[in-house]
A protein has these predicted regions:
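Small-residue-enriched transmembrane helix starts and helix-helix packing motifs
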Residues: 1-22, 99, 106-121
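Membrane-interface alpha-helices at helix entry/exit sites of multi-pass transporters
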Residues: 41-54, 146-159, 188
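Membrane helix-loop-helix hairpins that form the core translocation module of multi-pass transporters
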Residues: 47-96
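Juxtamembrane transmembrane-helix termini in multi-pass membrane transport proteins
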Residues: 12-64
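Structural signature of hydrophobic alpha-helical transmembrane segments
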Residues: 12-29, 78-88, 154-168
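Hydrophobic alpha-helical transmembrane segments in multi-pass integral membrane proteins
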Residues: 61-66, 125-139, 197-212
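Membrane interface segments of multi-pass transport proteins and intramembrane proteases
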Residues: 75-76, 170-190
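Transmembrane helix exit motif
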Residues: 88-108, 201-212
Length: 217
């Protein structure tokens, strides 16, 4: 029994970690964050990085636990959500792979009262793709055959979210130094690689969704 729960934890932790790291793509937020904070001193920059990562964690956790309720309220099946989420992820991955314009860049000079939340945390770090990944994981968790496994899977995804937010914070905390070291070319290569992985995750979501829809007929 313990090995079963451990297997569930490892599976959902790694799945959540890979999905979130790929869609959030922490290094890709560095140029935007650097532009957004270029007029701030080091203390203000670190404070914004910390607040943004806290917001990101809350957004993901709320999406994880409330996703099922939202689906029920609108009468959306898990299979349909997975197919739709897979399409969204595939489109986002295609844009990253082929270098389409990033919507975040267009907001880099925006002036908002709380830029740590908008546009940095949402949609700069956690956008629609992130929410699609998390709700997709939520649908998989709800199909487990025991409440103990569901609880274990939820804890695994929360732990993965915490790990990704910690990574994001570490990168944003050192954004200015890292951007200089990687250069524009390095960040572009990494973004394209993440785009390809995102397409793969999207295809997997679509296949899983179609399988669920077919078996429910």
């Amino acid at each position: 029994m313990t090995s079963e729960f451990l297997g569930v934890f490892v599976t959902f932790f790694l799945g959540g970690l890979l999905g979130l790291v790929t869609i959030i793509n922490p290094p890709a937020t560095l140029p935007f964050f650097t532009a957004l904070t270029r007029d701030l001193d080091d203390r203000e920059t670190r404070a914004m990085a910390r607040r943004a990562c806290i917001y990101c964690f809350l957004i993901v956790v709320v999406s994880l636990f409330a996703g099922g309720l939202i689906l029920t309220a609108f009468g959306i099946s898990y299979g349909a959500l997975r197919v739709a989420g897979g399409i969204v992820l595939g489109m986002l991955g295609h844009g990253m792979l082929y270098g389409k314009g990033d919507a975040v860049e267009s907001m880099s000079h925006a002036n908002h009262q709380n830029p740590a939340f908008f546009p940095l945390a949402l949609p700069g770090i956690t956008g629609p793709g992130t929410i699609a990944v998390v709700i997709g994981l939520s649908t998989e968790i709800r199909e487990l055959d025991a409440w103990g496994k569901e609880l274990t899977a939820y804890l695994a995804v929360v732990a993965a979210t915490l790990a990704v937010c910690a990574l994001e914070w570490a990168l944003l905390h050192s954004a200015r130094a890292i951007s200089k070291r990687m250069g524009a070319a390095g960040i572009e290569v990494l973004t394209r690689l993440m785009g390809f992985l995102l397409i793969c995750i999207g295809v997997q979501f679509i296949a899983s969704g179609i399988r669920t829809l077919v078996t429910s007929l």
